[in-house]
Design a protein with these regions (language model features):
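Acidic, Mg2+-coordinating phosphoryl-transfer loop and its flanking beta/alpha structural elements
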Residues: 147-188
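Metal-dependent phosphoesterase signature
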Residues: 44-85
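Short catalytic/ligand-binding loop motif for oxyanion handling, primarily in non-cytosolic enzymes
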Residues: 14-17, 21-22, 105-109, 133, ...
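Substrate-recognition "cap/lid" segment bordering the active-site pocket of phosphatases
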Residues: 101-151, 155-159
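Active-site neighborhood of HAD-like aspartate-dependent phosphohydrolases
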Residues: 1-61
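Substrate-recognition element of Asp-dependent hydrolases with the DxDx(T/V) motif
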Residues: 74-79, 83-113, 125-127
Length: 202
């Protein structure tokens, strides 16, 4: 029986941070560069609002408006490089599930996006949403689902996994990843994730 790996969606599979930047530029009329959306911070929640305030556009942008647009159409959100290829490779050795803390109202649009970008029928689960404060933590959900490892960009979720006896990979290089998570592995991109798992099996 294959071991189960849980994978986050936003900024792990889907380039949501980049979609947010481009949306913000379009709405505000201010051309912020990718590096301006990668600001060191110890707090994930409120990250975008702090960036907008720093550049004086907080009165023109609202995360809830961006999220509302995603309910019906997520086509502007790109697939991160090598995500589909590496996940397909991992599926040969592991049972892959997706665990997201997205607002549940995004479920239908999320399923459409996943079907367009990933191969196979991968189970999708919704964990606690930080803005709504409802549901189980990712660590609790991963433990309940029998996942031995979580791949996530959010250090809080990785800490939650470890607290529940689930291994964690902190994915990507984002400004909100300043906090240290003891016992977590850091992988900057999907090729690094594949390299890590290849090394585990040797």
């Amino acid at each position: 029986m294959k071991q189960t790996i849980a994978i986050d969606i936003d900024d792990v599979i889907a380039g949501t941070n980049e979609a947010m930047r481009l949306w913000g530029n379009r709405i505000s009329g201010v051309e912020l560069k990718p590096e301006q959306y990668n600001v060191p911070s110890n707090d994930y929640w409120g990250y975008y609002e702090r960036i907008w305030a720093e550049h004086g556009v907080e009165d023109r942008l609202d995360f809830d408006v961006f999220e509302t647009e995603l309910i019906q159409d997520q086509s502007q959100v790109p697939l991160l490089a090598s995500a589909s290829l590496v996940i397909e490779e991992l599926q040969k050795r592991f049972h892959i599930i997706l665990v997201t803390s997205r607002n549940p109202v995004l479920e239908a649009g999320t399923r459409v996006w996943l079907k367009e970008h990933l191969t196979g029928d991968i189970d999708l689960y919704f964990a606690k949403n930080g803005r709504m404060n409802i549901g189980r933590s990712k660590g609790e959900l991963c433990k309940e689902l029998g996942a031995f490892l979580l791949i996530d960009d959010n250090v809080d979720h990785c800490q939650s996994a470890i607290d529940n006896g689930v291994e964690a990979i902190i994915f990507g290089e984002y400004g909100w990843q300043n906090a240290v998570v003891e016992g977590a592995v850091k992988c900057r991109d999907w090729p690094a994730v594949l390299e890590y798992f290849n090394g585990r099996t040797k």
